[in-house]
A protein has these predicted regions:
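Short beta-strand element of the alpha/beta-hydrolase
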Residues: 22-30
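Serine-hydrolase catalytic-loop signature spanning alpha/beta hydrolases and amidase-signature enzymes
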Residues: 30-40, 51
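Catalytic histidine-centered segment of alpha/beta-hydrolase-like enzymes
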Residues: 273-282, 286
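Active-site loop/oxyanion-hole signature of alpha/beta-hydrolase fold enzymes
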Residues: 6-9, 14, 53-112, 116, ...
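Flexible "cap/lid" loop of the alpha/beta hydrolase fold
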Residues: 126, 133-166
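Conserved loop-alpha-helix segment in the C-terminal half of the alpha/beta-hydrolase fold
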Residues: 229-273
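Conserved alpha/beta-hydrolase "nucleophile elbow" surrounding the catalytic nucleophile
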Residues: 29-31, 109, 113-115, 239
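Conserved alpha/beta-hydrolase catalytic His-Asp/Glu region
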Residues: 147-148, 168-229
Length: 298
């Protein structure tokens, strides 16, 4: 694991060796997760493509440095200013990504984002048109604000992030519960354990901030316009049994892009797959990624 300071926060990342392919695949994880879940895909794709995965600010190993008592007074004002500027909105995380790519001298990239990471990838494509050559959204979609559903989701999410004691990691059988959450079939116990760790370790401010800033009515309604403005190719991969981001909502957002035709050329559905496609069906996802990239070689 390597680390780069981005706006005062150490960002953990893994970068595989360069290959003959001109584009770097950049993997962006979702809410309360980390870069770890991309490893099955990276193992399959890194022989052909250089791959970068990193932990979003406040998640995984990208944790803010605690403010010491000696300088807390001087920094409190700047922190308050940052907090009022939607620093946990997807667009803010896309700016973090732009700085990371600049620091790593990556000038040609395809962004592959899961769930919230997909939204960040779309914003990244809008902010970095010279660098981002295309986007693949995994288990990501939306663009329809259903007031009651979103209010319920935000309320449940806030309760979740409030009750995350570290001792939860030691609770017998808790990893078994996480192997069955939001997936079509139970995933390996290893991944259940990883999900518990990432759930508990996410920074409280980031966990709550990303939830609230990414699910406002304005933010959700902005997505279709964002997708429609993108000149780069954008593809959406859905899990047929995803109950978090149902395929119909994935296709809805995909339909605003120029690649979408009567048959939905840029919307792909993977059978027997829930909300963690990169862990549940890595071979199928890798095959779709290879196929997409083969149509955009330059």
């Amino acid at each position: 694991m390597a680390s780069i300071d981005i706006l005062g926060v150490p960002h953990a990342y893994d970068l595989t060796a360069p290959t003959a392919e001109p584009h770097v695949l950049v993997f962006i994880h979702g809410w309360l997760l980390s870069r770890q879940y991309w490893q099955p895909l990276i193992d399959l794709l890194s022989p052909t493509y250089q791959c970068l995965c990193y932990d979003l600010r406040g998640f995984g190993d990208s944790q803010p440095i605690p403010i010491s008592d000696s300088n807390s007074q001087g920094t409190s004002a700047s922190l308050k200013a940052n907090n009022t500027a939607c620093r946990y909105a997807p667009a803010a995380y896309a700016r973090d990504l732009g700085l990371l790519l600049e620091r790593l001298n990556i000038s040609s990239a395809w962004l592959i984002g899961h769930s919230l990471g997909g939204t960040i990838a779309l914003w990244g494509a809008a902010q970095l048109p010279y660098c981002v050559k295309g986007v693949i959204c995994l288990n990501a979609g939306g663009g329809i604000y259903l007031k009651e559903a979103f209010e319920r989701f935000r309320a449940v999410g806030e309760r979740l992030v409030k009750f995350r004691p570290r001792v939860l990691c030691n609770l017998p059988g808790i990893d078994w519960v996480f192997t069955r959450d939001s997936v079509a079939r139970p995933i390996a116990r290893y991944w259940g354990r990883q999900r518990v760790i990432d759930f508990v370790m996410a920074h409280p401010e980031a966990a709550r901030g990303t939830l609230l800033d990414s699910t406002t009515e304005a933010e959700v309604n902005r997505l279709p316009e964002l997708v429609s403005r993108l000149k780069q190719p954008v593809y959406f991969i859905a899990g047929a049994k995803d109950t978090i981001m149902e395929p119909k909502y994935v296709r809805h957002l995909a339909s605003f892009h120029q690649l979408f035709q009567a048959c939905g050329d840029n919307a792909i559905e993977i059978p027997d797959c829930g909300h963690l496609a990169m862990v549940e069906q890595p071979e199928a996802v890798a095959a779709q990624i290879r196929n997409i990239l083969s149509h955009h070689p330059g």
